[in-house]
UniProtKB/Swiss-Prot annotation:
Gene3D superfamilies attached to this UniProt entry: 3.30.420.40, Actin, Chain A, domain 4 (3.90.640.10)
Name of the protein in question: Actin, alpha skeletal muscle
Subcellular location: Cytoplasm, Cytoskeleton
Quaternary structure, from the entry: Polymerization of globular actin (G-actin) leads to a structural filament (F-actin) in the form of a two-stranded helix. Each actin can bind to 4 others.
Coiled-coil region list: none
One of the record's GO molecular function terms: ATP binding
Keywords associated with the record: ATP-binding, Cytoplasm, Cytoskeleton, Muscle protein, Nucleotide-binding
Family of the protein in this entry: Belongs to the actin family.
InterPro entries from the UniProt entry: Actin, Actin_CS, ATPase_NBD
Functional summary from the UniProt entry: Actins are highly conserved proteins that are involved in various types of cell motility and are ubiquitously expressed in all eukaryotic cells.
GO cellular component, one term: cytoskeleton
Organism: Pleurodeles waltl
Amino acid sequence: GNERFRCPETLFQPSFIGMESAGIHETTYNSIMKCDIDIRKDLYANNVMSGGTTMYPGIADRMQKEITALAPSTMKIKIIAPPERKYSVWIGGSILASLSTFQQMWITKQEYDEAGPSIVHRKCF
């Protein structure tokens, strides 16, 4: 039925489900615009879609169309949607967790049990 359309469309139009928030294309655009003007060209040309929510057919083409409509007309927009993107978030987290520089941010169960959620802010920010 039309759920196949409505479900992924919610990513671009959250108002479909009563949410007053920006779609993924607007959030991407707003994030790029908050960055230094000297790197925006690179950011527009290197958008990588990741996670299971991006597995909808045609989502990369739709993202390309929507970002192109928002960006300056001379800007090259490139949306990368690797076939393994369903697991790329987990893979990225796995790589990050294995870096020796990240170990100082590890939180043990004992630390969390003793300090609660505030330990995350103390160790990670």
